[in-house]
Amino acid sequence: MDKLEEIMASKRKSLEHVIRPIKARELETLARSKSPSIPFIEALSSPDQLSVIAEIKRKSPSAGDIAKGMNAVEQARVYNNSEADALSILTDTDYFGGSLNDLWDVVDFLHQHERITPCLRKDFMVHPIQVLEAAEAG
């Protein structure tokens, strides 16, 4: 088994307790009700300007620890103050040291400070329930 197969098997196993049938209508309804303040594509499409997606990542399978113990909200604050156009938040725990709570916390921070930086959940997406989780986080 190669590394990607190992990661995907681990991800499926970790989701066993939350998996339930998801209807397309449920995803569509959530998508309509959770539109971001500024669309992701719009945030990255300023003409004549380099767009930056800043990543919140503690470790990776290939590099090991990158920023062990990093506070996701503090890192988001640094990136936001540096005018990142969007944030990518790793939510995989086992291989990247993140969590879905990191996404919730960063989105809450941005809303509390009236910032409109779009956030992307970066994970191994193997089931539609993960899309719902990301949308619920904002």
Residue map of PLM features:
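Residues forming well-ordered secondary-structure scaffolds
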Residues: G98-N101, D105, V126-I129, A137
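Short, conserved beta-strand segments within well-ordered enzyme catalytic domains
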Residues: S51-E55, A86-S88, P118
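Alpha/beta enzyme core
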Residues: I66-L90, F109-E114, P128-G138
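Alpha-helix-loop-beta-strand connector modules within alpha/beta enzyme cores
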Residues: S35-E42, P47-D48, G97-L120
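Arg/Lys-rich RNA-binding interfaces used to dock onto structured RNA substrates
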Residues: K57-P61, M70-N71, S88-D94, G98-V106
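Glycine-rich beta-to-alpha transition loops that act as phosphate-gripper elements at the mouths
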Residues: E55-K59, K68-M70, F96-G97, P118-V131
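An N-cap/entry alpha-helix motif that binds or orients negatively charged groups
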Residues: D2-A67
